[in-house]
């Protein structure tokens, strides 16, 4: 069945944060990413090529599946080189509990602006086994399509919360609050606590003053510039 113009328009509208928020959904593209997410999020609808659909055995819970050609997928896709499958998932609802940082090591992001950078940080957090990231309200939207693609599936295992960072930090009791600075101590040479926060700042301005004054340990992360933070 061909994709309707309205559905293509809807998919393209998910580039807008307002639309994603209204619909409470996000877009993911490509076989590896979509396959990673299928077991973790409810899928609103999916469209894939005949070859990809034939390779899947666990799609029975999805009510809305459309077989498409590569050409049809290209019209709907936001990617320059579409790959076999596109899916729209429902955004998860997480309870933001700052006390998580009293029992495990978490990240906090202070106004990180670039969606690709945010997605990369989520991917790295997943790699290191960090399960929660607290973001300032002005940090990029994790459900931006560029951010989702950059997580490479990490969003399935990392919970991203948006909250007032100074308020969150003040609510913590006796936990280390690490901040990343150029004059900090090399993170690879410092023993890190198994709980607390590691704060990363804005790409150009770093950590804001209101958050910086709550940091009690300064760290330096070599090669952090690779993701422009």
List PLM regions with ranges.
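Active-site/ligand-binding-proximal alpha/beta "capping" segment
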Residues: 179-224
């Amino acid at each position: 069945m061909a994709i309707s113009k309205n559905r293509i328009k809807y998919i393209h509208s998910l580039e807008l944060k307002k639309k994603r928020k209204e619909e409470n959904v996000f877009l993911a593209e490509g076989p590896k990413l979509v396959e990673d997410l299928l077991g973790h999020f409810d899928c609103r609808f999916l469209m894939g090529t005949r070859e990809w659909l034939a390779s899947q055995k666990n799609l029975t819970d999805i009510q809305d599946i459309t077989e498409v050609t590569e050409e049809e997928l290209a019209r709907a896709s936001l990617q320059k080189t579409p790959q076999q499958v596109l899916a729209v998932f429902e955004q998860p609802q997480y309870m933001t509990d700052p006390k998580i940082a009293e029992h495990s090591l978490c990240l906090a992001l202070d106004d990180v602006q670039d969606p690709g950078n945010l997605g990369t940080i989520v991917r790295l957090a997943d790699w290191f086994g960090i399960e929660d990231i607290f973001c300032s309200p002005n940090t990029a939207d994790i459900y931006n399509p560029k951010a989702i693609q950059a997580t490479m599936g990490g969003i399935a295992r990392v919970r991203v919360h948006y909250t007032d960072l100074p308020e969150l930090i003040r609510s913590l009791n006796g936990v280390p609050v690490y901040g990343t600075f150029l004059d900090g101590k090399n993170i690879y040479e410092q023993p890190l606590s198994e709980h607390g926060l590691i704060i990363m700042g804005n790409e150009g301005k770093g950590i804001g003053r209101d958050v910086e004054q709550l940091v009690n340990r300064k760290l330096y992360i070599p090669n952090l510039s690779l993701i422009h933070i």
